[in-house]
Amino acid sequence: MAPLGYLLVLCSLKQALGSYPIWWSLAVGPQYSSLSTQPILCASIPGLVPKQLRFCRNYVEIMPSVAEGVKAGIQECQHQFRGRRWNCTTVSNSLAIFGPVLDKATRESAFVHAIASAGVAFAVTRSCAEGSAAICGCSSRLQGSPGEGWKWGGCSEDIEFGGMVSREFADARENRPDARSAMNRHNNEAGRQAIASHMHLKCKCHGLSGSCEVKTCWWSQPDFRTIGDFLKDKYDSASEMVVEKHRESRGWVETLRPRYTYFKVPTERDLVYYEASPNFCEPNPETGSFGTRDRTCNVSSHGIDGCDLLCCGRGHNARTERRREKCHCVFHWCCYVSCQECTRVYDVHTCK
């Protein structure tokens, strides 16, 4: 979470929240902590456009999964960027949970939209397969004929339904004829396509003594970490676009085209952006940068998590920490584990 002093500065900013996906705050606000005990109150979710409000009321039983999906997306973002200058910091007590970072059409904005959209599709799909909602369940659209020695069985996860929920809800506010809406729609879809392209068969053996005389198989989503890794690669290779304006019957419309014609045209699985990112080295409330001072760095790494790059050339401090940890653990039959407690010394390096 961001430091309090920085929050006070943020509060003084006049943020343009009209296009900000502030409904994401459902995943970190007080409603999230009470999901297991209280129903979702659609009217109390901040930032919903009328289409989202109608969707929430019609599908209220899957809204906890929507919140869980956004939460999973935020956590995966923080994992993927844990060693980078921008580490997906969230801002407490703010409807704009990422601060002004998402105001710009940068790579970071592209990734956050993609991983949040993917999170919603993933969580809804998994919840349906687990039988948590009466309006959805297992997929009845089994692709292909069974192979030799196996048959369809189990519960194939219905990514088409999960993707529909993500598309109808997450894309509902992205209907403006401007470049930013076009970018957000594209990256939201890239997140959903990341899951669809990683669906795979899972099988279970049946037979005496595990002989696997026959297998039953079903379609399953990958681990969400796989989706995070995939989208992080797409972040690193994101396509830079330029904005073009042209007149249509409804007025001026902004569209995106690749800045460099000698690169391949981005597919629906690629991320796109059209504004440069700040360097995130120093605190800057206008860009949402918290800087990298006091961040832990890896002194032995030459990558972005290394002290040279993460600390932006300012140097780093070194100290030792003594930590008490469990060690020499032994399993006893039956059934408990006993451990000793050891003191270990660690070298810690932090940015100046």
Curated annotation (Swiss-Prot):
Post-translational modifications reported in the UniProt record: Proteolytic processing by TIKI1 and TIKI2 promotes oxidation and formation of large disulfide-bond oligomers, leading to inactivation of WNT3A. Disulfide bonds have critical and distinct roles in secretion and activity. Loss of each conserved cysteine in WNT3A results in high molecular weight oxidized Wnt oligomers, which are formed through inter-Wnt disulfide bonding.
Residues anchoring lipid (O-palmitoleoyl serine): 209
Keyword Translocase attributed: no
Pfam entry (one): wnt
Site (Cleavage): 26-27
PROSITE patterns documented for this protein: WNT1
Gene Ontology molecular function, alphabetical: co-receptor binding; frizzled binding; identical protein binding; protein domain specific binding; receptor ligand activity; signaling receptor binding; transcription coactivator activity
A GO CC term attached to the entry: endoplasmic reticulum lumen
Effect the entry attributes to changing residue 77 to A: Forms oxidized oligomers regardless of TIKI2. Does not affect palmitoleoylation
Tissue: Dorsal portion of the neural tube (developing roof plate), and mesenchyme tissue surrounding the umbilical veins.
Entry keyword annotation includes Transmembrane: no
Known outcome of mutating residue 277 to A: Does not affect palmitoleoylation
Residues bearing attached sugar chains per UniProt: 87, 298
An annotated GO BP: BMP signaling pathway
Alphabetized UniProt keyword annotations: Developmental protein, Disulfide bond, Extracellular matrix, Glycoprotein, Lipoprotein, Secreted, Signal, Wnt signaling pathway
Localization per record: Secreted, Extracellular space, Extracellular matrix; Secreted
Signal peptide start and end residues: 1-18
Function: Ligand for members of the frizzled family of seven transmembrane receptors. Functions in the canonical Wnt signaling pathway that results in activation of transcription factors of the TCF/LEF family. Required for normal embryonic mesoderm development and formation of caudal somites. Required for normal morphogenesis of the developing neural tube. Mediates self-renewal of the stem cells at the bottom on intestinal crypts (in vitro).
Miscellaneous comment in the UniProt entry for this protein: Gene targeting that leads to the production of a truncated mRNA causes full embryonic lethality at 10.5 to 12.5 dpc.
Protein name: Protein Wnt-3a
UniProt source species: Mus musculus
